[in-house]
């Protein structure tokens, strides 16, 4: 990662105002890095509200264990982000992170050898760097994952497509999808979205770097009829629109989330 870009991403924070149904007038006010998980707040919230807390709700949506910045890009809340915490479905957040990082490693290399070769202590340090929002400690381990001895095979890239009520995304976009949806698999549920994923090579047949706009047009041609400019939709990454002429391999190194994924959110214009 370029130091100024990566430091800016790790420094960015989201202000939160969190309440519990048992104490609606006593909010827990804090901020959290965009490069973090809401679930890391649960021990503090359980102590603050003096009751078990394991799930977060925004309006009528039960939030998944995605990076905070990705959730903000998906739901576009006003700030401070007003959340409700309660007892409900919970996940082991360290497993969530490690599984996502393994998937990204497999996509990059065709195997997960790089991350599987990490020692137990290295894996622990990688996770604790996320917990501590420690870019320097994270980079010491993550650079070994990004600099494999073999050439990059594919770019770990997912496109999150918010769905309107009824499961529509503004028409049939004809995209390959991963079988994951917010809302318990119910595409008509509040806050539902599709995750679109395909194998994206870093170089084209002409050996030139693949650009974001090219891949968007190939993947979702009805939403992205132009590979040069946003016409019907744009994509957000870390809260900002991404230039369509950005090389994907460079984006991966400069702006992937801590789990190794480029996670774009579609915004229909």
From Swiss-Prot:
It is found in: Preautophagosomal structure membrane. GO terms for cellular component: Atg12-Atg5-Atg16 complex; autophagosome; mitochondria-associated endoplasmic reticulum membrane contact site; phagophore; phagophore assembly site membrane. Disruption phenotype: Blocks autophagy and displays increased sensitivity to nutrient limitation, with decreased conidial germination, growth and sporulation. Leads only to a modest decrease in virulence. GO terms for molecular function: Atg8-family ligase activity. Pfam families: ATG5_HBR, ATG5_UblA, ATG5_UblB. Induction: Expression is reduced when the vacuolar protein VLP4 is absent. GO terms for biological process: autophagy of mitochondrion; cellular response to nitrogen starvation; piecemeal microautophagy of the nucleus; protein transport. Belongs to the ATG5 family. This is Autophagy-related protein 5. It comes from Beauveria bassiana (strain ARSEF 2860) (White muscardine disease fungus).
């Amino acid at each position: 990662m370029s130091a100024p870009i990566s430091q800016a991403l790790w420094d960015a924070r989201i202000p939160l105002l969190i309440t519990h149904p048992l104490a609606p007038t006593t909010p827990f006010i804090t901020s959290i890095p965009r490069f973090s998980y809401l679930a890391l707040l649960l021990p503090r919230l359980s102590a603050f509200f003096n009751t078990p807390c394991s799930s977060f709700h925004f309006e009528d949506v039960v939030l998944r264990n995605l990076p905070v910045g990705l959730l903000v890009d998906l739901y576009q809340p006003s700030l401070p982000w007003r959340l409700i915490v309660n007892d409900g479905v919970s996940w082991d957040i360290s497993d969530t992170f490690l599984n996502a990082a393994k998937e990204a490693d497999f996509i990059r290399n065709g195997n997960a050898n790089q991350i599987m070769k990490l020692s137990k202590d290295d894996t622990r340090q990688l996770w604790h760097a996320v917990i501590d929002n420690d870019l320097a400690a994270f980079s010491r381990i993550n650079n070994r994952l990004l600099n494999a001895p073999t050439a990059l095979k594919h770019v770990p890239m997912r496109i999150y497509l918010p769905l309107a009520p009824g499961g529509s995304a503004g028409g049939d976009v004809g995209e390959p999808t991963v079988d994951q949806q917010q809302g318990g698999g119910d595409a008509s549920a509040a806050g539902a979205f599709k995750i679109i994923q395909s194998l994206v090579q870093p170089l084209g047949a002409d050996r030139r770097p693949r650009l974001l706009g090219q891949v968007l047009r190939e993947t979702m041609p009805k939403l992205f009829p132009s590979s040069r400019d946003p016409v019907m939709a744009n994509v957000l990454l870390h809260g900002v629109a991404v230039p369509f002429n950005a090389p994907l391999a460079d984006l991966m190194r400069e702006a992937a989330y801590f789990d190794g994924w480029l996670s774009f959110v579609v915004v229909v214009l």
